């Protein structure tokens, strides 16, 4: 077995190369030529000889059996039947053996001639426009192959001429000119045949509409002047064979050097663009050693027959793959063309037949991109080879990256409150189906683990299967044994982040539904209203060990996006623990003192003391708790019960606001009056959802990992138990009364009447009136909301069920209360964001609010508006889910190759971080301490006042150090960042810092790119689709926020005209802000001269006179155009802007994401350069290169005393970034499959399989996580994890 493992390890594919095959290579792959269009015989259903399914070419249909039946056993393996020519081997070879078709004439490859999505490669090599190449290939126009031997030639080399007479007349005029030259030459002998024929052709060409034999004229002209015309792929082939790549390369370089000084300015110039593209293609061909003529096909490979099968349907009908249809047409047309050539048919017929062959070969390769695709009987375009590769249903995404999995099932989920955190209840029928092979193995086993012979329960597999089908009594012990051996994986779609798949130990349950532990629902985003989940069984030892050691649900306490607990109690569980820890005065048994915990329980169960009663508990029974002095703790029965489940060493939990230590006012020491101290002690708030979350964080930080799920399970049990005992109910009569609303509404109505009057008088624009009305009603709702908050915090409502449910964090919030007995408020309406309007105000809110609350009831009109808003909410969610999913996909594709694979890259560059504030209202978006925690410093951090050293250089900032820095009021710090990591592949540990899910240094092999993409993409669905109105004045303008803004940033899209911010282009001081008739003018004095910026009247200016501005500083509010910012201020400013803007979008919606994940993405979007001066390097002008590779190249060139290249930074959006990775497999499986594979083939590119996707495609283990470990290490980790389960 070890030998086998070693053998398989060496089998790992190290790289994959793609190239353009020559005719010789294609013939070498082939096992024979396919000459007939037939597939299988309609009577015998056997493949026809020389046909598309021929056994002699592709291999036998049945294992080790030839076509005629002479050889029928494995013993004949390797022989070839003398009678039918079939090799005796396995039938699986029909999936790999190829055939070929020899074409009668050369044919162009459609990927090389078509312009979209990439420029036509043939057109670039020949320097002929793509339109003209197409005209020649499809036999519309002729191309000049030789301009003749005249001193001043009439035709140019490679000129495309239209001789049909339908279009331009110039070609006929030129031909007449040539003919006149021939006539003039033979003027002396007017009776010669040459002169007569020249005159005859000349006269025919005089009349533009008259047809003439182009072939005859062309041959005549060639004989006498050397001018040669060509048409079709043959002509293109001849030209390609004559191309001298080195010469072309030098010529283009010369051309570029003439205007490379202004290249930056010229980048959009069409001439420069085309020259750069040509240079690129010719350099690729030159370096790859591929002949340019390979772009024209002389042979077509025939794919293996089992990849394009014929399938018999019921009845005598057959269905076949579309590919066979294309091959059939190709063979028929090819054979017909051969015959026509033999018959020496006229050129018109010949050219038409050649064109038809060209078209059908095009259809085979790429049917969809033709103007008129070949269709089936039902008018459906047939699926060509390209269609089989691209898109969601293509080979890459359907068959290689997303396969259907065996040993899996799905069912509806229901709650399983009795389960432990690592358990899942699987229905018995499902267990029997999923674990069937394992159960059968145990049933028929003849030897036990020690090798002793035992009597099998079932004599053979058939009987074992019957026992399982009949659910025999004897199988259940075996089933119990089998399911203990392996956990199962549970997955809920959509899998937005890694917690969407977790492992559990299975338990058999009755019924047909899967039972899920209530604490993992948050991670799966599951609820029990009919959600379904899929179950998968890991098969190999390594998979089982990995599931146990890494994926078990009880290890996933913290969420990856922000390091906050994700396995927190919700709803009933919160309510139960809130009830349990509530304190009340004058309850039964108040003031009793107990010596130990058992006494408390005994008294409670004997109903001698209430669960909320304040009691005393001796600290002597709490031996391991960190008390300074012994005494009696003042607590409640409920809190004593709560503390009984916590680790013994943990501080006694009494006050939710101070969980780390117990305040001395809670302890009665010897000699103090217990009753007096009890009366003085304030009542503490019960433990709500936030407190429970804090407790879990403390547990996770200070105690072994396996302790946390144990406590969580107990919290869950108490939650359900005590929420039941609390018998909390709600009714209409629990809702408090509220009567102040009317006065607010009356005042608002008066104000609206005034605004309307002002609008009619022309003192306000309609936009201003609308904005003020919306603001007014929003203020009314805020006032109502404030009143309601005050009402529900009154002492008389302390025990009100609805208030308790909201206060504990179990369900509901202040906004629900406002709608319930305050007012419903403003509703949103649909709005087309993309319409290009000049109006500054986006009217996506109905300006008449809903003035009633739900308890009062709505009017018909209000009900309509309300339901309209609710329905819009539902459709928005559906829209958002798909858009957010697509964005996650793009993020993953951009960052999937970023893996931690180095301990330290020793960089001295980092980012300077400070608190992020919102420029409009100055509110804090993200504090400095939040930004630096779990990161490494580059420089030491000092207290800015006392100059005391707070943190040394190259030190990890823990949460304690971050707090220390925050207290010292430090304003900025220089820290390590993924953006500046100098590892050539992936990232190093120190640039990333701590893993948020473990609070330890991130491990080598962590696929941090994917985790970053998931952390940014997963909350995407929670972002709103609407445009927010920020600020308070009417002239504030709108800033796109929420999801649309995120898309705008990541796709690097220029903002719309009305939201574009004006930025300073140079450093200077604001001199003045003035206005003229058309705009406001901001005047800035720079070192050299004064600059003026004209901004619209309604723009919000964000600078004041005497302010210092820098390149890229905002002069007006709005969104900055990132490409413009790059030109003005450079890449560092762009990266900083990117980071701050993404964080603003999320934090304004209350979603926390760690900076470092955003930085990983920014790194991927900004780590490419464009070469503008090649120096002595091998680069070419305009080439895109990776920043770290470029840095290495420059260093090497400086060491070698050569002139280094010069490059400028580039920023790519998420649509372009994945295509710029070094892997063509990864890029092709993302988008633009055709373009990427064409480019890669011309380059002769090698994919070294650095990222994850390309390894998955080829069936390798991914180079991350346990992909770095040996099988033995993985299995050992699994065994250790099994011991830790409680």
UniProtKB/Swiss-Prot annotation:
Keywords: DNA-directed RNA polymerase, Magnesium, Metal-binding, Nucleotidyltransferase, Transcription, Transferase, Zinc. Binds 1 Mg(2+) ion per subunit. Its EC number is 2.7.7.6. Its cofactor is Mg(2+); Zn(2+). InterPro entries: DNA-dir_RpoC_beta_prime, DNA-dir_RpoC_beta_prime_bact, RNA_pol_asu, RNA_pol_N, RNA_pol_Rpb1_1, RNA_pol_Rpb1_3, RNA_pol_Rpb1_3_sf, RNA_pol_Rpb1_4. Mg(2+) binds at residues 527, 529, 531. The RNAP catalytic core consists of 2 alpha, 1 beta, 1 beta' and 1 omega subunit. When a sigma factor is associated with the core the holoenzyme is formed, which can initiate transcription. GO terms for biological process: DNA-templated transcription. Zn(2+) 1 binds at residues 66, 68, 81, 84. It holds the Pfam family RNA_pol_Rpb1_3. One of its GO terms (cellular component) is DNA-directed RNA polymerase complex. Belongs to the RNA polymerase beta' chain family. This is DNA-directed RNA polymerase subunit beta'. GO terms for molecular function: DNA binding; DNA-directed RNA polymerase activity; magnesium ion binding; zinc ion binding. Zn(2+) 2 binds at residues 905, 981, 988, 991. It catalyses: RNA(n) + a ribonucleoside 5'-triphosphate = RNA(n+1) + diphosphate. Signal peptide: none annotated. DNA-dependent RNA polymerase catalyzes the transcription of DNA into RNA using the four ribonucleoside triphosphates as substrates. It comes from the Bacteria. The lineage of its organism: Bacteria, Bacillati, Mycoplasmatota, Mycoplasmoidales, Mycoplasmoidaceae.
């Amino acid at each position: 077995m070890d030998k086998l493992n070693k053998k398989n390890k060496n089998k790992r594919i190290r790289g994959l190369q793609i190239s353009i095959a020559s005719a010789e290579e294609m013939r070498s792959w082939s096992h024979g030529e396919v000459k007939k269009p037939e597939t299988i015989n309609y009577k015998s259903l056997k493949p026809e000889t020389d046909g598309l399914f021929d056994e002699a070419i592709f291999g036998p249909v049945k294992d080790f059996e030839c076509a005629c039946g002479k050889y029928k056993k494995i013993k004949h393996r390797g022989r070839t039947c003398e009678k039918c020519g079939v090799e005796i081997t396995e039938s699986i070879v029909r999936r790999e053996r190829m055939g070929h078709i020899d074409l009668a004439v050369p044919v162009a490859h459609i990927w090389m001639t078509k312009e979209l999505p990439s420029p036509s490669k043939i057109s670039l090599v020949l320097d002929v426009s793509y339109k003209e190449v197409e005209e020649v290939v499809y036999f519309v126009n002729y191309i000049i192959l030789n301009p003749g031997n005249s001193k001043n030639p009439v035709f140019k080399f490679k000129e495309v001429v239209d001789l049909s007479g339908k279009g331009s007349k110039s070609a006929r005029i030129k031909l007449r000119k040539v003919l006149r030259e021939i006539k003039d030459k033979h003027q002396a002998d007017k009776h010669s045949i040459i002169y007569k024929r020249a005159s005859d052709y000349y006269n025919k060409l005089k009349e533009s509409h008259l047809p003439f034999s182009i072939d005859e004229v062309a041959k005549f002209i060639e004989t006498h002047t050397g001018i040669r015309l060509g048409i079709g792929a043959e002509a293109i082939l001849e030209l390609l064979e004559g191309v001298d790549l080195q010469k072309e390369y030098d010529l283009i370089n010369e051309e570029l050097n003439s205007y490379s000084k202004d290249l930056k300015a010229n980048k959009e110039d069409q001439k420069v663009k085309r020259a750069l593209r040509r240079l690129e293609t010719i350099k690729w061909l030159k370096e790859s050693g591929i002949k340019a003529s390979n772009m024209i096909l002389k042979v077509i490979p025939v794919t293996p027959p089992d990849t394009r099968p014929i399938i018999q349907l019921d009845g005598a009908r057959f269905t076949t793959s579309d590919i066979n249809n294309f091959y059939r047409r190709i063979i028929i047309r090819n054979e017909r063309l051969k015959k026509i050539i033999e018959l020496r048919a006229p050129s018109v017929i010949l050219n038409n037949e050649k064109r038809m062959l060209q078209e059908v070969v095009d259809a085979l390769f790429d049917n969809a991109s033709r103007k008129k695709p070949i269709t089936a009987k039902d008018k459906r375009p047939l699926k060509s080879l390209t269609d089989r590769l691209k898109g969601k249903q293509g080979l890459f995404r359907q068959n290689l990256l997303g396969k259907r999995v065996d040993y899996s099932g799905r069912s509806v989920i229901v709650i399983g409150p009795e389960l432990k955190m690592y358990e899942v209840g699987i229905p018995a029928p499902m267990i029997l189906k999923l674990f069937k092979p394992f159960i059968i193995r145990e049933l028929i086993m003849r030897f036990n683990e020690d090798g002793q012979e035992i009597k099998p329960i079932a004599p053979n597999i058939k009987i074992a299967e019957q026992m399982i089908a009949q659910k025999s009594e004897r199988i259940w012990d075996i089933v119990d044994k089998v399911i203990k051996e392996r956990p199962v994986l549970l997955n809920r779609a959509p899998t937005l982040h890694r917690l969407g798949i977790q492992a559990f130990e299975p338990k058999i349950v009755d019924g047909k539904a899967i039972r899920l532990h209530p604490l993992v629902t948050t991670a799966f985003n599951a609820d029990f209203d009919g959600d379904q989940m899929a179950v998968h069984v890991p098969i190999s030892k390594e998979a089982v060990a990995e599931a146990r050691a890494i994926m078990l649900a009880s290890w996933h306490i913290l969420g990856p996006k922000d390091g906050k607990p994700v396995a927190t109690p919700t709803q009933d569980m919160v309510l139960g623990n809130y009830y349990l820890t509530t304190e009340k005065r004058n309850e039964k048994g108040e003031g009793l003192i107990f010596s130990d915990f058992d006494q408390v329980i005994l008294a409670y169960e004997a109903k001698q003391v209430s669960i909320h009663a304040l009691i005393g508990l001796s600290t002597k029974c709490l031996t391991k708790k960190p008390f300074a002095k012994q005494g009696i703790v003042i607590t409640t029965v409920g809190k004593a019960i709560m503390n009984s489940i916590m680790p013994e060493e943990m501080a006694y939990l009494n006050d939710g606001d101070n969980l780390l230590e117990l305040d001395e006012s809670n302890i009665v020491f010897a000699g103090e009056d217990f009753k007096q101290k009890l009366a003085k002690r304030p009542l503490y708030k019960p433990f709500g959802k936030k407190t429970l979350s804090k407790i879990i964080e403390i547990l996770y930080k200070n105690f072994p990992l396996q302790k946390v799920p144990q406590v969580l399970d107990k919290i869950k049990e108490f939650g359900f138990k005590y929420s039941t005992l609390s018998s909390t109910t709600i009714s209409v009569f629990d809702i408090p009364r509220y009567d102040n609303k009317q006065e607010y509404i009356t005042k608002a109505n008066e104000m609206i009447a005034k605004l309307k009057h002002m609008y009619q008088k022309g003192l306000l624009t309609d936009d201003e009136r609308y904005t003020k009305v919306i603001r007014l009603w929003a203020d009314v709702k805020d006032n109502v909301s404030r009143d309601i908050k005050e009402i529900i915090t009154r002492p008389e409502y302390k025990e009100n069920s609805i208030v308790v449910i909201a206060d504990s964090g179990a369900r509901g919030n202040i906004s629900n209360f406002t709608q319930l007995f305050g007012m419903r408020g403003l509703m949103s309406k649909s709005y087309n964001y993309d319409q290009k309007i000049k109006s500054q105000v986006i009217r996506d809110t109905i300006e008449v609010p809903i003035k009633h609350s739900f308890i009062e009831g709505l009017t018909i009109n209000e009900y309509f508006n309300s339901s309209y808003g609710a329905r819009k909410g539902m459709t928005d969610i559906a829209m958002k889910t798909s858009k957010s999913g697509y964005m996650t996909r793009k993020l993953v594709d951009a960052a999937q190759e970023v893996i931690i694979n180095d301990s330290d890259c020793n960089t001295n560059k980092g980012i300077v971080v400070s608190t992020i504030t919102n420029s409009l209202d100055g509110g804090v978006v993200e504090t400095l301490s939040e930004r630096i925690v779990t990161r490494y410093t580059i420089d030491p951090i000092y207290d800015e006042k006392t100059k005391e050293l707070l943190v040394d250089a190259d030190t990890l900032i823990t949460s304690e150090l971050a707090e220390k820095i925050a207290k010292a009021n430090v304003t900025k710090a220089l820290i390590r960042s993924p953006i500046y990591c100098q590892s050539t592949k992936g990232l190093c540990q120190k640039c990333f810092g701590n893993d948020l899910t473990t609070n330890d240094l991130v491990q080598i092999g962590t696929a941090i790119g994917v985790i970053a993409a998931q952390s940014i993409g997963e909350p995407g669905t929670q972002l709103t689709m609407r445009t927010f109105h920020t600020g308070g004045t009417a002239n504030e303008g709108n800033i796109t926020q929420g999801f649309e803004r995120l898309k705008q940033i990541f796709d690097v899209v220029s903002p719309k005209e009305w939201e574009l911010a004006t930025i300073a282009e140079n450093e200077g001081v604001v001199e003045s802000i003035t206005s003229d008739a058309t705009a406001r003018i901001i005047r800035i004095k720079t070192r050299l001269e004064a600059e003026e910026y004209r901004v619209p009247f309604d723009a919000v200016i964000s600078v004041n006179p005497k302010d210092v501005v820098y390149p890229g500083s905002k002069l007006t509010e709005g969104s900055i155009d990132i490409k413009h910012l790059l030109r003005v201020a450079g890449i560092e400013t762009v990266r900083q802007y990117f980071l701050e803007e993404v964080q603003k979008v999320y934090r304004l919606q209350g979603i926390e994401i760690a900076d470092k994940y955003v930085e990983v993405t920014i790194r991927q979007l900004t780590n490419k350069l464009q070469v503008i001066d090649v120096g002595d390097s091998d680069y070419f002008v305009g080439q895109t290169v990776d920043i770290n590779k470029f840095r290495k190249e420059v260093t090497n060139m400086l060491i070698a005393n050569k002139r280094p290249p010069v490059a400028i930074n580039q920023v790519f959006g998420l649509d372009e970034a994945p295509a710029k990775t070094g892997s063509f497999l990864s890029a092709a499986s993302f988008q633009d499959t055709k373009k990427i594979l064409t480019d890669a083939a011309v380059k002769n590119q090698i994919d070294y399989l650095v990222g994850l996707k390309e390894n998955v495609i080829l069936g390798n283990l991914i180079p991350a996580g346990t992909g770095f470990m040996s099988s033995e290490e993985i299995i050992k980790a699994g065994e250790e994890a099994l011991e830790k389960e409680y």
